[in-house]
């Protein structure tokens, strides 16, 4: 672990890193879903650490206008899902892959669009200028890490779709509505570090 990440962001980020590393995720349950994707959970190392999130462009075919982490489908040339997440983050929000300090990954989650999505947790220095790829990203925003990890901010709705019951998580931050897979990923991270 580079001292720059800890010293720039203080004790609270060090505590998060320690808890994350001490409580590694349990292996996910088997899924017959053979389509793989990965997202980067970018933790920006500010004096008060933040999560960087995107609002997807309104013209996209899937998940248009939704809040999401940068990420996408694994390409055949990707050597790992970590590489997938880093490649997508560079394409979508201009985070150089070389600038990300990967802490680890969470267990995969199944998406409503048929992908098994693996969240990759990474630290990003605060001196990077983030800008969204206009074709994919309508906007960027940050939420304080410890606000995002407060479990009491997440609500759920049980829905019946396609003959199957699903629990959908949702939350708000200022004017941003965070729901679905993105809310489920943040909630899972919060459960793992138990802050």
From Swiss-Prot:
Probably mediates the hydrolysis of some nucleoside diphosphate derivatives. Mg(2+) binds at residues 88, 92. One of its GO terms (biological process) is nucleoside diphosphate metabolic process. NCBIfam families: PRK10707.1. It comes from Yersinia enterocolitica serotype O:8 / biotype 1B (strain NCTC 13174 / 8081). Disulfide bonds: none annotated. Belongs to the Nudix hydrolase family. PCD1 subfamily. The keyword Metal-binding applies. The keyword Magnesium applies. Its EC number is 3.6.1.-. Pfam families: NUDIX (PF00293). PANTHER family: MITOCHONDRIAL COENZYME A DIPHOSPHATASE NUDT8, NUDIX HYDROLASE. It is an enzyme of class 3 (hydrolase). This is Uncharacterized Nudix hydrolase NudL. One of its GO terms (molecular function) is magnesium ion binding. InterPro entries: CoAse (IPR045121), NUDIX_hydrolase-like_dom_sf (IPR015797), NUDIX_hydrolase_dom (IPR000086), NUDIX_hydrolase_NudL_CS (IPR000059), Nudix_NudL (IPR023735). HAMAP family: Nudix_NudL.
């Amino acid at each position: 672990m580079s001292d720059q990440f800890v010293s720039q962001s203080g004790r609270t980020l060090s505590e998060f890193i320690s808890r994350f590393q001490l409580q590694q995720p349990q292996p996910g349950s088997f899924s017959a879903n053979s389509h793989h994707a990965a997202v980067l959970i970018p933790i920006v190392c500010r004096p008060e650490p933040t999560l960087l999130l995107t609002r997807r462009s309104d013209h996209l075919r899937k998940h248009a206008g939704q809040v999401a982490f940068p990420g996408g489908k694994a390409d055949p040339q990707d050597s790992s899902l970590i590489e997938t997440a880093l490649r997508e983050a560079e394409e979508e929000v201009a985070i150089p892959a070389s600038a990300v300090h990967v802490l680890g990954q969470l267990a995969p989650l199944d998406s409503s669009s048929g992908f098994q999505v693996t969240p990759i947790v990474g630290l990003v220095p605060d001196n990077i200028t983030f800008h969204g790829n206009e074709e994919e990203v309508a906007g960027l925003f940050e939420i304080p890490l410890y606000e995002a990890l407060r479990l009491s901010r997440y609500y759920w709705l049980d829905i019946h779709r396609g003959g199957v019951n699903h629990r959908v998580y949702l939350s708000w931050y200022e004017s941003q509505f965070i729901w679905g897979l993105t809310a489920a990923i943040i909630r899972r991270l919060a459960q793992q570090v138990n802050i």
